[in-house]
Amino acid sequence: MSPKVNRYSEKIILAPMVRINTLPMRLLALEYGADLVYSEEIVDHKLIKCRRIINEKLGTVDFFDTEDKVAFQTCSAEKDKVILQIGTADPGRALKAAKLFEQDVSGIDVNMGCPKGFSLKGGMGAALLTNPELVYEILSTLTNNLSVPVTCKIRCLPSLEKTLELVKIIQSTGVSAVAVHGRTKDERTQHKNRNDYIREISRYLTIPVIANGGSGEINCYEDIEKFRRETEASSVMIARSPESNCSIFRKDGLLPLEEVIVDYLKYSIKCDSGLHNVKYCVQRMMGSYQATTRGQACIRANSVRDICNLYNLADYYDSFYEDSNPDRFLDNL
C-alpha cells in the first residue's frame, strides 16, 4: 500500500463542517484522538484569491481573502493531519487553488456531496454526482499535478449500480481514498444511512473507503468501530457527534461538556479566533443548554473574552496577550 493510500487506512476522521472546522476545533479533535481532520469546504473562487501570510505572533500560517478575513488558518501541529476540502466545478481552477495550499496541508479533498442550493447552482458538490466526465477531469488533474494525496467525498446515487459505476470512475483517477456519505442528495438526517451501499462500495474498490453519515447512531467511541464493522469500510468520518462533543474521539470516553468547551476556548484564544466563529461553535456544543443562564449570556456576549469569562477563563485570555507568555505560540503545543 502506497504512503498516500495508507494515510487514509484505518483512520477516525473529523468530517468537514461549515463554520465548525476552523483551526481550534481541528486541534481539539486531534488532541482527543482523531487521526485526520478536514477543513470546512472552501470554494475555489475564494481560495485562488487568498494571500499566504506567516503569522509569527501566533505560530500559524494564515490565508487572507480579498476582504482581509482569514479564510484558512493552520499550524505545524496539524501539518500531517489536516485535509483541505475544496468546492469546485472546474479542473483548472481546482488545481490553481490546491497549488496555493499544497505545502501547508496533508491532502486535498474535493466536495462532491454537498446538497445545498449554492453548491448545486454552481455545478459543485452533489451536482458532480451526475457528471462523471467532469468528476474524472477534476480528480485526474489534481492527482497528476499534486504532491499530496487527493480524495473526494460523495453521496450515494439512488441506485447501488449507478453508485458503483461512479466510484469505479473515481478510483481510476488515482485518488488515495473516497469518503461516502450513505444518503442521496435529496435525503437528510431523518433518513436512514445506506450502510449497505457503503459496504458494497468497500468490497468493490481497492482503495480505502471512508464511511460517513452514521453520526446519529454514534454516541460513544465504541460506536465508531461498530459503524466501521457494519459498513466494512477502512475508515470512519464523523460530523454531528464531534460537533456536539468533540471528546467522542477519546478512547477513554466522553468528557463533561463544560470541560470540552473550556478546551475549545483555550485553542480559540491561541488562534486569536473571531467572536462570531467562537460563539457559533460554543452554541452548537451547548445545544439545549443555550436556554440556561450561561447560554443566554453567551448569546449576548460582545467579545471572545466575554465568553471566556463565563467559563472562568478571563485571566487565561488576558495572560495570552502578554508578550512574556511563552504558551501563546501554537508551536509550543
Give each language-model segment a name.
Residues M1-V18, L23-P24, E31, E137-S147, ...:
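Alpha/beta catalytic cores of nucleotide-metabolism and tRNA/nucleoside-modifying enzymes
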Residues S2-N6, M17-L100:
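Glycine-rich, positively charged N-terminal anion/phosphate-binding segment
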Residues M17-R19, I42-D44, G87-A89, G113-P115, ...:
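Active-site beta-loop-alpha junctions enriched in small/polar residues
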Residues S39, G107-P115, S172-R183, S235-P242:
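Non-cysteine beta-strand/loop elements that form the S-adenosyl-L-methionine
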Residues E56, D80, G117-V135, R183-N195, ...:
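Glycine-rich tight-turn/loop motif centered on a GG-T
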Residues D62-V150, R155-Q171:
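Active-site beta->alpha loop and helix N-cap motifs at the rims of alpha/beta catalytic domains
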